[in-house]
């Protein structure tokens, strides 16, 4: 008697991944046509790229403001050109008065601006110096020593400058004295030369007068003898 072996059951489990051959449509699947896919992609693109609310509000607020500003720019340009056309003949007629007045006003304004700039620069310099001194000083107990040191340096600098100024003043005085002496000597020399020249001219004139008198006397004596 033969023994029968029961058949083995084999279970096959399908995976979640499927591979379909070209042209084979699985049951229950639906493929979109190219037209439907294009329309859907265009609608998605336009929905993503469409203007937002903030952009619409910005356009609605910017267009009136830009138009008003452009209108004001045109009106301002027209008014400026009209005023220039009207003021040019008047400026030509009254230029002898307006030009000096304009120059004077410009110089005054420039003077005020220059004075203010110098004042602000000076105040800024003082503020910077004070801040620099406050930052560079190590501690409060060294302030007195630093101040004494700075005062000593300032006194030494002033003394040196005073000595240099005195030396220069002395040199200038000596130069002036030497120039004055040279001037006096030149004046005395010129006076002596002038006196000698006058004496020579007087002697020559006297000699001419004496010669003329002698000649006249000789002529008179000759006439009397004849």
Swiss-Prot record:
Region spans: Disordered: 164-226
Topology within the bilayer: Multi-pass membrane protein
GO (cellular component) term, any one: membrane
Compositional bias (Low complexity): 217-226
Alphabetically ordered keywords of this record: Lipid droplet, Membrane, Repeat, Transmembrane, Transmembrane helix
Localization (cell): Lipid droplet; Membrane
Residue ranges with Basic and acidic residues bias: 164-173, 181-216
Main subcellular location of this protein, as a coarse class: other
This protein's record includes keyword Transmembrane helix: yes
First and last residues of every Sequence repeat: 159-165, 166-173, 184-191, 192-199, 200-207
Transmembrane segments: 56-76, 90-110, 111-131
Lineage: superkingdom: Eukaryota
A Pfam family it matches: Oleosin
Residues covered by region (3 X 8 AA tandem repeats): 184-207
Region: 2 X 7 AA tandem repeats, residue numbers: 159-173
Region (Hydrophobic): 77-130
Chain positions covered by the region annotation Polar: 1-76
GO biological process: lipid storage; response to freezing; seed oilbody biogenesis
The protein's role, per its UniProt record: May have a structural role to stabilize the lipid body during desiccation of the seed by preventing coalescence of the oil. Probably interacts with both lipid and phospholipid moieties of lipid bodies. May also provide recognition signals for specific lipase anchorage in lipolysis during seedling growth.
Family designation: Belongs to the oleosin family.
Protein name in UniProt: P24 oleosin isoform A
């Amino acid at each position: 008697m033969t023994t029968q072996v029961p058949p083995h059951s084999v279970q096959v489990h399908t995976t979640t991944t499927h591979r379909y051959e070209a042209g084979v449509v699985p049951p229950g699947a639906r493929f979109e046509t190219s037209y439907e896919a294009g329309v859907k992609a265009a609608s998605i693109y336009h929905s993503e790229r469409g203007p937002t609310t903030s952009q619409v509000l910005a356009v609605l607020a910017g267009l009136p403001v830009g138009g008003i500003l452009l209108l004001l720019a045109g009106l301002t340009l027209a008014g400026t050109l009209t005023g220039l056309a009207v003021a040019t003949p008047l400026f030509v007629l009254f230029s002898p008065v307006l030009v000096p007045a304009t120059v004077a006003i410009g110089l005054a304004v420039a003077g005020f601006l220059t004075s203010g700039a110098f004042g602000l620069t000076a105040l800024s310099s003082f503020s910077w110096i004070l801040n620099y001194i406050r930052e560079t000083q190590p501690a409060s107990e060294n302030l007195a020593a630093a101040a004494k040191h700075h005062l000593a340096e300032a006194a030494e600098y002033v003394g040196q400058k005073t000595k240099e100024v005195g030396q220069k003043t002395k040199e200038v005085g000596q130069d002036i004295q030497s120039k004055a002496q040279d001037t006096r000597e030149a004046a005395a020399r010129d006076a002596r030369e002038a006196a000698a020249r006058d004496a020579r001219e007087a002697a020559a004139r006297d000699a001419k007068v004496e010669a003329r008198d002698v000649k006249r006397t000789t002529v008179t004596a000759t006439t009397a003898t004849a």
